[in-house]
A protein has these predicted regions:
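Conserved short alpha-helical segments that host acidic/polar catalytic motifs at enzyme active sites
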Residues: 1-169
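A short, hydrophobic C-terminal helix/tail in secreted or cell-surface proteins
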Residues: 170-174
């Protein structure tokens, strides 16, 4: 069967920028990238900007140009911000509500994290139930919120995000 037998189905778009030199308006760059990626997701969108460790963001239902008015985009533009991430969404899991828009920003005892995710967790419901039994309170219904809780839980247990990443992403040698 040819590759063209199945219709195209776009599922979200994710963008990230790190401007080491500090010469770019990372919020504007994220906006432009999301505008270009908008064909991959027209339900919701969002941008999170890291300004010297302080993460602020905006996300909502709607098209990029509707969600990011000049005033909203201006509030994210910081001359000292060097990082931003953005997301446009078509729901592949979870419902079409503002709480499922990304990036999700999580504040916890050791810092703040913004997370964008494209895809589905095959065991999301099982993980969600386990986390709820441990006290997690979910505000939306997306897999991304499950990932946020898992990363945060392990960050608090292990001390650094680098340790979490290394521990959980390192494949065993055979």
């Amino acid at each position: 069967m040819s590759d063209f037998a199945y219709p195209l189905h776009e599922e979200c778009g994710v963008f990230g920028i790190y401007d080491r030199a500090g010469t770019e308006d990372v919020a504007a760059a994220a906006y432009s990238a999301l505008y270009a990626l908008q064909h991959r997701g027209q339900e919701s969108c969002g941008i999170a900007v890291n300004d010297d460790g302080v993460i602020n963001g905006h996300r909502d239902l709607g098209l990029v140009n509707e969600v990011f008015t000049p005033a909203v985009l201006g509030s994210l533009a910081k001359p000292t911000a060097h990082m931003a991430t953005g997301h446009v969404r078509y729901a592949t899991s979870g419902s079409r509500i503002r709480a499922n828009a990304q990036p999700m920003i999580v504040r916890h005892g050791r810092g703040t994290m913004a997370l964008c995710h494209n895809g589905n967790l095959t065991n999301a419901l099982e993980l969600r139930r386990q986390l709820e039994n441990e006290g997690a309170i979910f505000h939306g219904s997306s897999d991304t919120e499950v990932i946020c809780y898992l990363v945060t839980r392990n960050r608090l247990r292990m001390g650094s995000i680098e340790t979490v990443s290394y521990t959980h992403l390192t494949l065993p040698t055979i």
